Each structure stands twice: as structure tokens, then as C-alpha cells.
């Protein structure tokens, strides 16, 4: 197996992009990554695109061919990858494996979602849950994560204020991210007084409905410096599955897919949680920021809330979490999220993150899950 490097990244602004089409968003991200990498479209051997539900959001399937055609990249092989909200992370992993195996040399891995072209995106999002046991019974993702939050509060004493701090820190970071959907700060009081969605989760505990796209260019590590002076190396790419339905979990305060993917990633990279300088976690709801730092091994079980409350997860803390603003404030266009996380880590390791830069960052991690944790992808990168 060959070592793999990231030589180019790009991300559109995330938000309610009414005047930008699905086709133009993904083309903007792809061409931006190609330019950043210093390659030509003709250099690309293959494309992998993460997308959860274009068929429901924009009534368009067969998007792999559509994107290659619209971007002027035909006839390269183009493959759509779907794993709910982890679609981007698995598209990245597919591209990494294609290069590592020697099957392709230069690959683009991208992600895109256009969520605002429907009146109500909830039915499309609900397809990421168990249809028979959850969606058809009226269960929504806010209510599922609310149950996880309530149980964590019961088991470990996690407080409402600690949940709010996840959002506060994300917005603090996003205020320095020009690509973020919500680049403004919020207070604990604002989070706790926002509209109730599913007790104990309020509106400002929840990631938004977003449009956006992101892309990365991958190549063999020994070729990377032919294109860039600042390659970022893939140290590990791991994926795990878990139960899709929440009621099947042995413990709803732990996402087993995250635990297993992280364990495999650390083993592959020959690293420990203490070696990580920053991490982009999948905080679709505030409780998942807390669960993520526990399941990834950064703190002991039950200590996640305290880590946010004490400032451990701030940019200048022991383990900076979501310098981009995370899903909560940067935005969460489902299929693009896993790629956008990787782009942020690359910018951080290059020292190109501006006011949100983690000082001296050498090693970064991304954590991307689907649904309530039926799928997890964990990647580790280094300078």
C-alpha cells in the first residue's frame, strides 16, 4: 500500500445559497481544489462524490455522471458515495483507498448537498434513520439525540449549561471563518433561551439546514511535492458500522462506530489521543460534541461536558475542537461535511487558518458519522 497525501482543498461558503445551483456549487469546490493543488482537470484519474439525498432534495439521481459532465471532467470514472451524513467521510476514504492501492494516482474526493430546494427537508433527512422502527413512528433526529442527551445527563450529571457551551465555542470559532454559515458569537443564555426543539435540546443546540460543497485532491505521498510545497499526509483512514436504530444500542450514551473507527485509526497511525493537536467532530447536535470527545478517547466517559465547560476544547485549549465552527456554526450540508472537515484540518496544518489558527498544529483528526452513529469515519492527517 502507498502512502497518500492531500495536495489541494476547497470549500464553498455554507448557508442558504438560494442563488447557487447544486451543479455550480460542486463545480466551484472542485475547481477550487484543482487550482489549489496545481493540477489540471486532465490529470485526474477518478472522482468520488459524497451525497446523501439529491434524489429527494433536488429530484436528481445519477449525480456522479452529472457532476463529471458539468465540471468538464468526463470521461473519468465518477462514483457517488452514500452513508447519510457520513457520505463525505466515506467519499474521502474511497479516494484514499484508490490512491493507496495503486489503482489511481490523482483523485478528487468531494461532497455536496443542496438542502434548501424543498419546502420541508425533514422527510429526506429522516431516511437516515431506521424507517420501520423510527421514521415511520414519527421519530426525528432532534428527538433521538435528545434521548441521548437526557440519558447522558442522568448517568453522568451533564448539565444544560455544558450542552450550551458546545454551541458557544463553535460560534466563537465560526466568527473567524468566512466560509461559515453563522459567523457570529452566541452566549450560554442565548442558547438556553432559544426555542425548544426536543427537550433538552433547543434551537441553538442544533446544526442548521445548509447548502454547500467541498473537495480535496489526493495523490501518492512520493508525488506530492511535484505539485505543492505544503502537502498534508494521510496517517490513517478508518470506518466502522454500528446499529442504525437507537433502541438496539446497548448504551445510548456511546456511539460504538465512533469508538471502533477511532481505535482502528489510532492503531493505523501509531498514535494516541494525546498526539492530536486539533479535531473536527460531528456535532450535529450539542450532545454529540460531548459524546465525540469521549468516544474518540480525548476524555474519560462522562467528562465530555466538563471538557467544554472548562475550556479544554477551545482553540487555545488542550484539545481544540472544531476550529471551523463545526456542524453547528460552520454549517452541515450533509454530504459535504466530511470533506469540509478534512479541508479545515489541511488549512490548519498548513498554517493557513487565519484568526482561528491552532498554534503549532502538526496532527489533526476528523470524525464524521451517519444518522445517530450507524456509520463512522475517522481520519488522521499530519504535516
Curated annotation (Swiss-Prot):
<feature type="active site" description="Proton acceptor">
    <location>
        <position position="332"/>
    </location>
</feature>
<feature type="binding site">
    <location>
        <position position="209"/>
    </location>
    <ligand>
        <name>CoA</name>
    </ligand>
</feature>
<dbReference type="InterPro" id="IPR055140">
    <property type="entry name" value="Thiolase_C_2"/>
</dbReference>
<dbReference type="Pfam" id="PF22691">
    <property type="entry name" value="Thiolase_C_1"/>
</dbReference>
<comment type="pathway">
    <text>Metabolic intermediate biosynthesis; (R)-mevalonate biosynthesis; (R)-mevalonate from acetyl-CoA: step 1/3.</text>
</comment>
<keyword id="KW-0808">Transferase</keyword>
<comment type="similarity">
    <text>Belongs to the thiolase-like superfamily. Thiolase family.</text>
</comment>
<dbReference type="InterPro" id="IPR002155">
    <property type="entry name" value="Thiolase"/>
</dbReference>
<dbReference type="GO" id="GO:0016747">
    <property type="term" value="F:acyltransferase activity, transferring groups other than amino-acyl groups"/>
</dbReference>
<feature type="binding site">
    <location>
        <position position="328"/>
    </location>
    <ligand>
        <name>CoA</name>
    </ligand>
</feature>
<dbReference type="InterPro" id="IPR020616">
    <property type="entry name" value="Thiolase_N"/>
</dbReference>
<protein>
    <recommendedName>
        <fullName>Acetyl-CoA acetyltransferase</fullName>
        <ecNumber>2.3.1.9</ecNumber>
    </recommendedName>
</protein>
<dbReference type="Pfam" id="PF00108">
    <property type="entry name" value="Thiolase_N"/>
</dbReference>
<feature type="binding site">
    <location>
        <position position="206"/>
    </location>
    <ligand>
        <name>CoA</name>
    </ligand>
</feature>
<feature type="binding site">
    <location>
        <position position="207"/>
    </location>
    <ligand>
        <name>CoA</name>
    </ligand>
</feature>
<keyword id="KW-0414">Isoprene biosynthesis</keyword>
<dbReference type="InterPro" id="IPR016039">
    <property type="entry name" value="Thiolase-like"/>
</dbReference>
<feature type="active site" description="Acyl-thioester intermediate">
    <location>
        <position position="85"/>
    </location>
</feature>
<dbReference type="GO" id="GO:0008299">
    <property type="term" value="P:isoprenoid biosynthetic process"/>
</dbReference>
<keyword id="KW-0012">Acyltransferase</keyword>
<comment type="function">
    <text>Catalyzes the condensation of two acetyl-coA molecules into acetoacetyl-CoA. Functions in the mevalonate (MVA) pathway leading to isopentenyl diphosphate (IPP), a key precursor for the biosynthesis of isoprenoid compounds that are building blocks of archaeal membrane lipids.</text>
</comment>
<comment type="subunit">
    <text>Interacts with HMG-CoA synthase (HMGCS) that catalyzes the second step in the pathway and with a DUF35 protein. The acetoacetyl-CoA thiolase/HMG-CoA synthase complex channels the intermediate via a fused CoA-binding site, which allows for efficient coupling of the endergonic thiolase reaction with the exergonic HMGCS reaction.</text>
</comment>
